[in-house]
């Protein structure tokens, strides 16, 4: 069971095969959207997630992946967006959304927080903790403890510096933070969403 500590409360979040604990300790092709190798001005890949809620489109989130800092983690996410390995994020859900904290997704096998896999196998090690959870829009890996990264990820909606050194930050929202806020609006303190929030399409931008 994935344990997410919010202040004195412990919120259960399921992640990983065998319901391994995904620890978010808190104190308070998918289709290809264009040519391969699309980059931001920094030379890092840009990917997109098109998101809908109960069948209604919410919009597009564009993410810059920090391949210059965490290349292996960034490549995992990029390939899961394009679906080039035969599996990926398209059709999966934001299964856990906690307002004033984060929006979690990436379980494309079980769709409830108990599954997912990386392009390197079931799990891969923490690459580094160079990047920090500095504020809204930070893109970070969910995990079940040290060196258990798979496909689940979360987008922060506040600064979450208590997660530094525990979760690998590998990107940030470049465009579409308004869409992230819409996703957040369907969340709850327990993490259960009031609508089914689906990644309807995803890929790499040209």
From Swiss-Prot:
PROSITE patterns: CSA_PPIASE_1, CSA_PPIASE_2. The modification N6-succinyllysine is found at residues 66, 85, 174, 189. It catalyses: [protein]-peptidylproline (omega=180) = [protein]-peptidylproline (omega=0). The modification S-nitrosocysteine is found at residue 202. SUPFAM superfamilies: Cyclophilin-like. Disruption phenotype: Mice are developmentally normal and show no apparent anomalies. Mitochondria do not undergo cyclosporin A-sensitive mitochondrial permeability transtition. Cells show resistance to necrotic cell death induced by reactive oxygen species and Ca(2+) overload, and animals show a high level of resistance to ischaemia/reperfusion-induced cardiac injury. Mice show a dramatic reduction in brain infarct size after acute middle cerebral artery occlusion and reperfusion. Pfam families: Pro_isomerase. It is an enzyme of class 5 (isomerase). One of its GO terms (molecular function) is peptidyl-prolyl cis-trans isomerase activity. GO terms for biological process: apoptotic mitochondrial changes; apoptotic process; cellular response to arsenic-containing substance; cellular response to calcium ion; cellular response to hydrogen peroxide; mitochondrial depolarization; mitochondrial outer membrane permeabilization involved in programmed cell death; mitochondrion organization. Residues 1-29 form a transit peptide. The keyword Isomerase applies. One of its GO terms (cellular component) is mitochondrial matrix. CDD domains: cyclophilin_ABH_like (cd01926). PPIase that catalyzes the cis-trans isomerization of proline imidic peptide bonds in oligopeptides and may therefore assist protein folding. Involved in regulation of the mitochondrial permeability transition pore (mPTP). It is proposed that its association with the mPTP is masking a binding site for inhibiting inorganic phosphate (Pi) and promotes the open probability of the mPTP leading to apoptosis or necrosis; the requirement of the PPIase activity for this function is debated. In cooperation with mitochondrial p53/TP53 is involved in activating oxidative stress-induced necrosis. Belongs to the cyclophilin-type PPIase family. This is Peptidyl-prolyl cis-trans isomerase F, mitochondrial. The gene is Ppif.
